[in-house]
Amino acid sequence: SKSVEKNIISGFTSAGSDLSCKDVYLKVNDEKISRSTFSYGETFIICFDDVKGFTSENGYVFPGMGIVITDRAEDTLMMAEDLYNRYTDGMNFSPLQLTANLTVTDPIRSKGEYTLTINIWDKKGNGTFISKFDFKVIENEKIEPQIKNVSYNEIYLFSQGNNKVITDNIVHFEDNIYIIVEGLKGFKAENGVVFPGMELKGTDSSDDIILDYDDLFADYSETGIAESDFSSRVSAHFKLTGTAFNNPLNCELKIWDKKSNASLTVTTEMILK
């Protein structure tokens, strides 16, 4: 049997041949969602509930799941041939729920539109179930950049402790927090070297000074930094200790060119827990 369905709520378009699925939807932080726009670095889970039609062998079924992500030019950015290749002995869950995780980071970029295609198939039969989902990726709206004669690809917060991009601006004591800028261009290069300065300031809601660094690149004022390394990624990081704090942390990172008037200023508020 064959079926085609467009889920208005979830945004998925699905087509099944001998395989069927009760519901296809997304979850973020264990909550079912119906949006199709995500912040750079955000993770969502694609859920296929009560998948039926697989050929059964001694009560076990053998699904495969492949994922492809393409951009609007239909260029393939990411591909996973089979997320379930480790289940060589099959599955006997009932009802059968199949899931996949996606974190929207490099090679996915903010300010872009993409298509996610998921192909589920029966390794012991001919059944298939294909779902497509169009989504957009935006910059973290809690981060405000001001540019002067520069351009950049991405600006985001990163937790070393959790090894992931911070999208809700909630940070924790004792964690190493990074403010990362990728693809920063516009600085004047001399023999392949640029001469940046980097200032990091932070205050709490009582205007107490929490972070105060005038130039994190002071040691490179004479030698400079290789332009290729600088434009690839530049970052500042900090760690806050203790337990008492007057939220929020108002943070400002300024990166400027010591050889021109080019600069990037990043302001953001973080909540410490």
Give names to the regions the model predicted.
Residues 3-42, 138-176:
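Short, compositionally biased P/S/T/A/G/V-rich stretches that sit at domain boundaries
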Residues 32-64, 166-197:
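Contiguous beta-strand segments within globular domains
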Residues 53-55, 103-109, 239-245:
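Short, surface-exposed loop/turn segments at beta-strand-coil junctions that are enriched for proline
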Residues 54, 109-111, 121-130, 256-265:
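Short acidic/polar inter-strand loop motif in beta-rich domains
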Residues 62-77, 195-211:
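Extended low-complexity, serine/threonine- and proline-enriched intrinsically disordered segments
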Residues 81-105, 215-241:
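A beta-strand/beta-hairpin structural motif
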Residues 112-119, 247-256:
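A short tyrosine-centered beta-strand micro-motif
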Residues 128-151, 262-273:
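Short beta-strand elements
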